[in-house]
Amino acid sequence: MNIIGVILVIFFAVQIAVKSGLSRIEQQPYKVLAVFRQFEIRNYPESLIAQTVCTGNKYKAVARTGFNKVAGFIFGKNSAGKRIPMTAPVRIEFGSEFSRVEFVMPLAYSASTLPKSIDASVQIKTWPGGNYAAIRFGGFPNDQKIRKAIEALEAELTVSGISFKDEPVYLGYNPPYQIMFRRNEVIIPVEWKSAE
């Protein structure tokens, strides 16, 4: 086997190891209520989140600044000085001038047991959950891919006659060093009455 073959084998082995390691990271729970051709309807329960507000609405700048602030909180910049396990996905709510970057806290924590942030720009909030439409896309996220996913989801919802609020949230599930098997989503709140 030549050197390129060896490098490719190592590369694929590392990517598979990263993917399997990520499967052990706690993910925000949800229940799938309905599956359509391009999207699904989910119900998310109430969640505890750590959130920071960033100036701007461009993915790269908001993700970097916001991620670093909230990551500081879970990596020990908190009243207990202890690490909080990372969860997935990282959530970004884009606004026209300001955007919010949020990490969902592990289910083992409640508002009373979660350490307080020592960085005033990181706030602990309760996210109410609710019914959301979700669409998935792969690769590395950027403004164009996120906008395209939002437009595709809104078009599918309109065609399907499902009422929605124009409040999209980007969900990123992977670390930047994961090149293959990337999972990105956009969710949008919808009016949905389950047939249960």
Regions found by a protein language model. Give the residues of each.
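A solvent-exposed interaction/effector surface
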Residues: 1-196
